[in-house]
Amino acid sequence: MNNTAGQPLYQRIANDFTAQITSGALKAGERLPSERQMAEELGASRMTARQALKLLEKRRLVETPVGRGAFVAHSQIEQQLS
């Protein structure tokens, strides 16, 4: 994860996922780690993981259907490729 001074942890997490999505490392429809998994892997709280996912949703890079998890959005990837 990038260590950008002055940025909150949730923004750094979201920026890292943004880079993975836009580079194609994470594909459209691919499931992201759960809040719990993300928090454990990154040494953060679940609230921080939740904030990162909300920011990715706001950027339209991730879709989070209720009760199903978080997935890389199809529409944003397709728009970037056109």
Describe every region a protein language model picked out.
Residues P33-S34, E63, R68-H74:
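Minor-groove-contacting beta-hairpin "wing" of winged helix-turn-helix DNA-binding domains
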Residues M1-R46, K54, K58, I77-S82:
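Extreme N-terminal segment that seeds HTH/winged-HTH DNA-binding domains in transcriptional regulators
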